[in-house]
Every structure is written in structure tokens, then in C-alpha cells.
């Protein structure tokens, strides 16, 4: 099976002294040189695997990347379901259908929606509507939505009610 292009790239940095974690998103359309050709960074994994992704992200940010964590859509959905879903405020209408991927995204602006794993995937992946409208700054605004979502996930994971679900989350991550 052909490897697919990477949907989202996030560098996590943990400072053991301050015990703070920082997340930096790399826009999927960032242009990099791969094999002497200018390509989008989201092509790096299918071309050169983890090694190439680590190298390119490290070069862009001027850091050494020690580890790579890969989460496919199934794992993503499983993690969100394991923590009981996430509540998100929808800041703009989201209406997109891609029957080829069985992807159907329909959220209304102004609503707070409880996202189970499938709905969370839809929210996380949304970039534009069927009519071409969408985020003014494309992937940069998509990253902002993703960061809000990730912050909500972190808050929930750190909550007392979720601590009891750590074993099932670890099991999903080990797949």
C-alpha cells in the first residue's frame, strides 16, 4: 500500500527544567528540497520515512528532532473516543464532502459541538467548504483550529476524570 502524504506535522518540545511543553505546527504546504526538487513537506514521509521528516523539520526549525510519533486517522479517532470526546466551539460554517474518502464535514458556526473520534477527525481535517469558501489564510488558519483542538485535548487528558483512561489511551498508541 502506498504511503499517504502527511496531513499534519507538529513538533513537540519538552523542557525538563521548566516542565513546559511547546507545540509548533509546520504548515503542510511548506516548500522543502527533497532529492534536489522543491516539494511540499507533506511528501517527505512517503519518500524518505521518519528519517527524512526528522531531517527536514530539524533543518526548518534549527533543532535536533529526537523522536517521531505517527498517528493515523484510526488511532486519532480511538484516542479521542478513549478520553470521551472533546467539546469545541465552531467559529465558522464547515460544509465539505469528499465521497472518495468517505469524509463528510458539517458543522454550524456558533454551536458548541461534542466531538467523538469521527467528528473530531472531521473538525481536524477541515480546510474549505464545497463552494470553495473557507479559511482566509488556508492551512495557517487550519493550524490555529488544530491547536485549539489539541489544547482542549491536553486539558481533558490532564483532568482527573481522564486519568483513569490512561491504560486504554496507551494501548491505542502502541498499535
Language-model segments: residues:
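Non-catalytic, solvent-exposed segments at the cell envelope interface
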Residues: 1-175
